[in-house]
Structure formats: structure tokens, C-alpha cells
């Protein structure tokens, strides 16, 4: 286990993945780029995210926020600590129909958001081919 993993295990409740196989799964997205991350944290709370940011700052490590990994330009791969928001940090926090405002967590899938908005005659107007996976 790496030093970074040891520190994070004492500071977060989320799932940590530092084995080579798991890191390899996060080394690619829909682009041609391949970059092995240092490790992966699936945060379970805002406290996990804050702690991960603190540890990254203390250790001089970059952070990479990731959801569905559907980028075709390589934005979701890097030699960094990956925060995978797709597992626990998804969903709608607030839907304010009067003001046509929606607050979501970063891991929500675009199609799921639009399914929730459709009964209200609304949709989030981003039309991508990966909407069933894109966050």
C-alpha cells in the first residue's frame, strides 16, 4: 500500500482503490489517452471530499474529479488521485420548478437527470451520444 493510501485510510470513509488492476480500469476513458492514476477514492460524503483535498494538498498530489469516464478528449485520466463521484455522489439534491433550477451531485448520469425532469416539461439541453453514461 502506498503512503498516500495509508494516510487516506485514516481520514476518509469512502471506498479506496490502490491496486494495479483497479487503477488500470481508471487509466482510460473514451479517448486514446492512457494515464495510470495514483489511486481512486469513491467519496461517501462531503467530508470525504474535503479530507481528500486536504491530503492531496499536504502530499503535493493532483486531484481529478471523475464520473462516467466518457470524455473523448482525455479530461478524466491523469496521474492523480481520482475522485469517482459516480458511485455515491449522484442524484438530484434540489428541484425548484418555480425558478427552473436544479441542483445535482456531480455523479448524476445525464439520462437520469432528464428522466426526472421530463414529467415537468423540462430537460437539460446537452445532447451527447454518451448521455446514458455521461455525468
Where are these regions (language model features)?
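A glycine-rich phosphate-binding loop feature that marks nucleotide/adenosyl-phosphate handling sites
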Residues: 22, 72-73, 131-135
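Intrinsic disorder at enzyme termini
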Residues: 1-5
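N-terminal glycine-rich flavin-associated loop
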Residues: 8, 31-63, 85-130
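Conserved PLP cofactor-binding pocket of PLP-dependent enzymes
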Residues: 66
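Conserved oxyanion/phosphate-binding beta-strand-loop segments in alpha/beta enzyme cores
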Residues: 6-27
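Short acidic, glycine/serine/threonine-rich loops at helix termini
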Residues: 74-79, 114-116
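Short glycine-aspartate micro-motif
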Residues: 82
Amino acid at each position: 500500500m502506498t503512503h498516500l493510501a495509508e494516510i487516506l485510510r485514516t481520514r476518509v470513509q469512502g471506498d479506496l482503490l490502490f491496486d494495479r488492476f483497479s487503477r488500470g480500469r481508471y487509466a482510460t476513458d473514451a479517448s486514446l489517452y492512457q494515464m495510470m492514476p495514483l489511486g481512486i477514492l469513491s467519496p461517501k460524503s462531503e467530508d470525504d471530499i474535503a479530507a481528500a483535498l486536504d491530503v492531496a494538498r499536504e502530499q503535493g498530489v493532483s486531484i481529478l474529479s471523475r464520473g462516467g469516464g466518457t470524455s473523448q478528449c482525455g479530461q478524466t485520466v491523469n496521474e492523480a488521485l481520482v475522485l469517482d463521484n459516480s458511485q455515491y455522489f449522484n442524484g438530484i439534491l434540489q428541484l425548484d420548478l418555480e425558478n427552473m433550477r436544479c441542483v445535482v451531485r456531480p455523479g448524476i448520469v445525464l439520462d437520469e437527470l432528464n428522466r426526472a425532469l421530463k414529467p415537468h416539461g423540462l430537460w437539460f439541453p446537452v445532447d451527447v451520444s454518451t448521455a446514458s453514461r455521461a455525468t
